[in-house]
Amino acid sequence: MAFRKENKIKSNFSKITIGLASPEEILENSSGEVLKPETINYRTYKPERDGLFCERIFGPIKDYECHCGKYKRIRYKGIVCDRCGVEVTEKKVRRERMGHIHLVVPVAHIWYFRSLPNKIGYLLGLPTKKLDSIIYYERYVVIQPGCVDTVGELDLLSEEEYLDILDSLPRENQLLEDTDPNKFIAKIGAEAVYDLLARLDLDSLSYELRHRANTDTSQQRKNEALKRLQVVESFRASRGRNKPEWMIMKVIPVIPPELRPLVPLDGGRFATSDLNDLYRRVIIRNNRLKRLIDIKAPEVILRNEKRMLQEAVDSLFDNSRKSSAVKTDANRPLKSLSDSLKGKQGRFRQNLLGKRVDYSARSVIVVGPELKMHECGLPKNMAAELYKPFVIRKLIECGIVKTVKSAKKIVDRKEPVVWDILEYVMKGHPVLLNRAPTLHRLGIQAFQPKLIEGKAIQLHPLACTAFNADFDGDQMAVHLPLGNEAVLEAQMLMLASHNILNPANGAPITVPSQDMVLGLYYITKLRKGTQGEGLTFYGPEEATIAYNEKKLDIHAPIHVYVEDLDENGNLVKTMVETSVGRLMVNEFVPKEIGYVNEVLGKKSLRDIIGRVIKACGVARTAQFLDDIKNLGYYMAFKGGLSFNLADVLIPPEKDELVQKGYDEVEQIMANYNMGFITNNERYNQIIDTWTHVNSNLSNILIKQLTADNDGFNSIYMMMDSGARGSKEQIRQLSGMRGLMAKPQKSGAEGGQIIENPILSNFKEGLSVLEYFISTHGARKGLADTALKTADAGYLTRRLVDVSHDVIVNEEDCGTLRGLVCTELKNNEEVIASLYERILGRVSVHDVIHPITGEVIVRSGEEIREDAAKAIQDSPIESVEIRSVLTCESKKGVCAKCYGRNLATNRMVQKGEVVGVIAAQSIGEPGTQLTLRTFHVGGIASNIATENSITSKYDGILEIDELRAVEAVDEVSGKKHLVVVSRLAEMRIVDPNTKIVLLTHNIPYGSKLFFNNGDSIKKGDVIIEWDPFNAVIVSEVSGKIEFESLVENVTYKVESDETTGLKEKIIIESKDKTKAPAAHIVDENGNYLKNYSLPLGAHVVKDNGDVVKAGEVLVKIPRAVGKAGDITGGLPRVTELFEARNPSNPAVVSEIDGEVGFGKIKRGNREITVTSKLGEVKKYMVPLSKQLLVQENDYIRAGMPLSDGATTPSDILAIKGPTAVQEYIVNEVQDVYRLQGVKINDKHFEVIVRQMMRKVEVVDPGDTRFLEQQIVDKLEVMDENDRIWGKKVVTDPGDSQTLQAGQIVTARKLRDENSMLKRRDLKLVEVRDAIPATANQILQGITRAALQTNSFMSAASFQETTKVLNEAAINGKVDRLEGLKENVICGHLIPAGTGQREFDKLIVGAKDEFDRIFANRKNVVDFNAMDKDDEE
């Protein structure tokens, strides 16, 4: 496919077009016809002439040597031998010269009639079955009925019918010209299809189909027409580039022989590429057919042979598509041309995107604690081999040897002189280290190598986190950057000491771990009652002297004068209480951040490193990290911090707690046996009991460990510092192992918990049964991990594929839109603070402090740390920030919308590949997510339910949408309101500034103790409600009557275990006509209100009871929302990114309105929503679902009517694009947060932006789009701009140039009409052009990746043949804008240092530039020349 310019391949092309090849093009690219199926002469091993490996066609096998040996050596280059016809040239031309095969009969290309959608079938309007019967020579097709009126065009005829018609025709009919409309023409095979395609008039077909799509009433026919239109339009769009008849081939190309090699094995056998077999079958059948035609064989035999030729060509192009694939002797299907492109082993992924490189090595890694942050240790032999060319050059330069060959020998012999030169060559020439799997960009970093003895690579211990490496036998690969630019990039951008921050969240990633943390924790911990406690020293030096003289313990609390920062950030001397250990640490801490006086655990270390980076920059941080690394290791060794069995303390209270647990369980079992509680409740209560025992034991245990040895218990120190181990693990060592999950068959059925806990811990040892139960979980864990890794890897791949072309392409796109950002809360607990969410983003508006009125941030400015802190501390609740979701860049995104680059803490630069970084940041922690679906069961999850709203502020209460009835508390006799509206919302407002301090929804049925407009004091309880039950409250007073309440049909009676009261519980009735309901009537029996009773409701009142307004009629236990399984972890992330609909979706209201209940039909209840304007929507909700609304409730659009998860497509349709974007971002964030993984929002936003790129055309208007077509947002905008202000001709009048339906500019129309007017002819009539309207759609990442503008990127992702197939017909052009396309073409990626604007730069020395600049009069001005050209 390379451009052949004098046989040179141009590599600086800027786009690639794909299309169908015409027979002429195939011949033009071919170097000769392959006539024989022979490959190689088995005796001479030379290619046969005119065969598949022929030298005359494809070029010589040996460099500059013809077949017969008449011409040898380079001096005959370019001569064509007169005896054997071989051109004398290099042998590598056999990699690029193509041949061809002339087929006797045309053959259909399998891609275009066997794949869906069936392209040839759609063009001709034939179903696949019929088309197959024509192509495979079973039926004749009528191409032109002529004078025969019994058949029509495209009718299929059997052979008998065909012959009958021929017989009935007059003799001279067959002698007519083919163009004569009276001639009857019917043909068979691909030839017939060729004729049909060649006769198509695409323009009129397009017009006819458009008309049909617009006017047809039947939806099915309309869809059919639209499908056909798409194919027709794609051929029309690629005008001249593609003709439909080229889907039928008369010539097929033969790929170059070196790409389908034939290798002789020992023993006279050959290993051959499958393609050779496939080509051979085509040639044999083609030649046999030629001969049969020459000897005038009977039609039957010919037809069979033609069919076999069609099948042979089919299997050559795509063997896997056929039902009867051609197999080898070993019963393995042969690999056809399509198979060599597909899949992981195909051309795209194996050879174009992932190549093996030279100058690389790999070895085991060991720890290098004495290395600097930017260094690694490289074994001598490895280095000598890697740097060989550089060493050789230096040896020759220094005059040690004269030739390259002798220099090589010296290096191979490893003579002493080599090592000195190697040292010299390695200076300033870093190597890249890579550990597989490379999950994010920190998996490859550059280091300055140091020569070491041995055979293992030494790695800096702080770089382990980024590589996810440990030293239990991990291996790493070394690569050597060769070019100057590569070396420079490795040093400036990839050096390990420059990559201290994690691009996923901006936190330091090179944080000391394990031993280092332990050592630092140990020396910074204070201990009372040690030698020298309470002494005061003048300065750190004195204290150190006292320590060295053994007069002072390292943990002793002492007072010292040190330099620390005051409020204004200036260094001053102050007295602090500290210890010698902390003084040691502070020797290394940069002065800019003051005196660090705290116990150093992993968390606090991370914060300190973050502060150091901000204050002192990267270089100083690297220095600081190395210093504390050394101190940490040294002190861990000095402290002798190991642990023994006696450090594992078992709390003495354990037996008592376990006994108590057994007693409770016995009580629960007794209740169950007496029938007070159901089996499910019993199970939940038992699980609950043991969970409590376990957590109580853990708390006692941790308390005890903390007290042990003044907190210097080794195990406790390891846990507390964050070096190793967790509370969970310590609990298992010395508490009890607790409850275990039952092994489940598949990930789908959430794991039940075994109700007998493991009471032993590891110190006491487990019994056989306990061991058996626990070993099961452990093994399953290992199996899960293996599966999970593959899943996470696949997720990353899809994410990269969808986002790789998101590059920062401009500074500012100038959009006025943004996202409103607030802090995220879950039940009043702040999950993500406003500070975290707005830091490093750009504000849309000026942010003004509401009380002081000062401007904190100007619009279009980055919100830096101090500004974010100021906003957080002020009463501002939300800030509108720029986001990639609202960015309006045409290509990629702009820097302002993206904000800060988290890896550098500065605004993102042009050319940063934010898409790939986002994909890696989300994919990399994927392996830490769980695979299982969480089981939420029992009371365990409902412990901390809030049941009231207490004011945290003084202020004034405002309430919206309130409907309430007064009621009196039976116990205290106080009055309160009972809320009966579902949309009530309360706000507390600051009385002076009117700023909203707190907003909250008021739950239905809650008690309200204040009125609208009341003053509230801090700590007042405003509202309270029953946290365990949803209720139905009577809104009026009256008598209650029940309908359809029949014992054991619609309800059953159960007794409450605590009170012994009997309750009626509504059950699902077999009799679907009965719908239980409660009516409230007045004395005269008039209905006042009725309430429908949902499943599982506990009816509190009896028939005929008198109720007061505000009394509870029905309780619906909340826990009835069954112990459901939440899809968690990786499957949930995949579900969201793929925009899949959940298994039990909620029914959602599309409008604001009042709820009404309709009839029950077929197990579904009809619910109507009526808006204030009278619009009515009907929804069918299955009876098995719990309803979330009552009759007469007023609800808002987007609110669910039934339980279940809301589908993303519903949110998009009802609440719009912004809502669905935020929904996906927040939902995915929740999954990661649950695992304690921090990822910045902007990464998710980048992916979601890519999911929302396309729109679906609803009404194409006068544009070139089709209905239901899916197109880029920008394309629709551009097309609408193009036809804006133009006119559509409705009646061309007497105009010669215009036709009906043509789109013209107003000016052209004016000229035309004035001309017609002058001649007194009929004028042209027009209407305004109508623009297209389109709906935003949400695509899953896989679909979005396949729909990119670049066909090469899509083809290398998935469904390769389908993508190429579509692209070829559309004559698509790939403009090489993303990363993948450029990698495939072997170009630099258009990002970072490969940005296209750098292509014009010339890099040179400074003095050179100064010299040119001084004599610049003589220098040609390139810019001026460019301008002239443009003019």
From Swiss-Prot:
Catalytic activity as recorded in UniProt: RNA(n) + a ribonucleoside 5'-triphosphate = RNA(n+1) + diphosphate
EC class: transferase
GO BP: any one term: DNA-templated transcription
GO CC terms of this entry: DNA-directed RNA polymerase complex
Top-level taxon of the source organism: Bacteria
Cofactor(s) in the UniProt record: Mg(2+); Zn(2+)
GO molecular function (one): DNA binding
Residues that hold Zn(2+) 1 according to the record: 66, 68, 81, 84
Pfam family, one: RNA_pol_Rpb1_4
Record-stated family: Belongs to the RNA polymerase beta' chain family.
Role of this protein: DNA-dependent RNA polymerase catalyzes the transcription of DNA into RNA using the four ribonucleoside triphosphates as substrates.
Protein name as catalogued: DNA-directed RNA polymerase subunit beta'
Gene coding for it: rpoC
